[in-house]
């Protein structure tokens, strides 16, 4: 697979990989100073926002999700010897939605999606459909 710029002057080989360790290390660097990612990891792992969490623990959470995508038939791609990494789920191979303990967060992050509209626009790809298919209580 090759990713090309809009003007086609340069291109970069993008390779599918199963090297979860190297992919995780790239993501550790990418999200090292991302407070937004730290916030989401805490929410998804049911950790209070005020609790101190080490970088090693956040990295373990990133590694866990990377491994889950790999194990559940998601795809991991890398470019330029792991200078960049992308992870996605293929249609029908989505991770289960992970609700947090915070109802207001769940309403914003999950429930406010208009699932009927998502179905009409999504053609079975991406994150919206598995969220729509989960049972609501």
Curated annotation (Swiss-Prot):
Which InterPro entries does UniProt cross-reference here? N-acetyltrans/Recomb-assoc
The lineage's top-level taxon is Eukaryota
Q: What is this protein called?
A: Uncharacterized protein YOR012W
**Organism whose genome encodes this protein:** Saccharomyces cerevisiae (strain ATCC 204508 / S288c)
């Amino acid at each position: 697979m090759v990713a090309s710029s809009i003007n086609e002057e340069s291109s970069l080989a993008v390779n599918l990989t199963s090297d979860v360790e190297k992919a995780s290390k790239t993501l550790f660097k990418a999200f090292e100073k991302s407070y937004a990612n730290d916030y989401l990891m805490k929410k998804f792992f049911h950790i209070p926002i005020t609790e101190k969490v080490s970088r090693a623990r956040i990295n373990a959470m990133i590694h866990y999700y990377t491994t889950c995508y790999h194990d559940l038939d998601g795809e991991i791609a890398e470019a330029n010897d792991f200078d960049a990494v992308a992870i996605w789920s293929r249609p029908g191979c989505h991770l289960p939605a992970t609700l947090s303990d915070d109802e207001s967060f769940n309403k914003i992050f999950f429930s406010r999606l208009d699932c009927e509209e998502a179905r009409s626009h999504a053609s079975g790809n991406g994150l919206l459909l598995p969220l729509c298919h989960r049972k609501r209580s």
